[in-house]
Amino acid sequence: MQMDVIWEDINANLNHVEELLKDLPESDIVVLPEMFTTAFTISAPTLAEGNDGITMQTVSQWAKKYNSLFVGSFIAEEGGRYYNRAFAAFPNGNKVFYDKRHLFLGGEERIFTAGSEPLVFEYEGWNINLAICFDLRFPTWLRNKDLKYDLLI
């Protein structure tokens, strides 16, 4: 989904996506932008959420309502650390998460903690691997044949 993300305004962005979804044709997978609720920002301490925060509550509702897999990322806080965390929210209410492994050296590494584990999950017969932005610059990470995925998002 293409959208103009409103700088550091979680509620406004959730409302904006809700409006865009009204005109979206039926879809198996809806892919939202990186940090779609805040835009890319280093204001993690004031904008971070847990995996059960307003972003994931809302996305889970959308997944069920539209019977689609929703994928995107948000600023997550866990154990006093901040992550650029990707999610996949399933129509049945399940959720899986991936923390961005390769942080951009323009300051992202000073705020966020890098993830350490890839994520491959199954949806509608497809094995799907999640990556976030700068991860794509590290093809050996993504070409790992042991991951056995069909689709990279």
Give the positions of each predicted feature:
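Short beta-strand segments enriched in small/hydrophobic residues
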Residues: M1-D4
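Cys-nucleophile CN-hydrolase/nitrilase-fold catalytic domain and related Cys-dependent amidase chemistry
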Residues: I10-N11, E19-P91
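Short secondary-structure boundary/capping elements
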Residues: A12, N51-I54, I111-T113, R137
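Short, acidic/polar
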Residues: A12-K22, L136-R143
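Active-site catalytic loop in hydrolytic enzyme cores
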Residues: E77-L147
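Short, intrinsically disordered, charge-balanced linker/junction segments flanking boundaries
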Residues: L147-I153
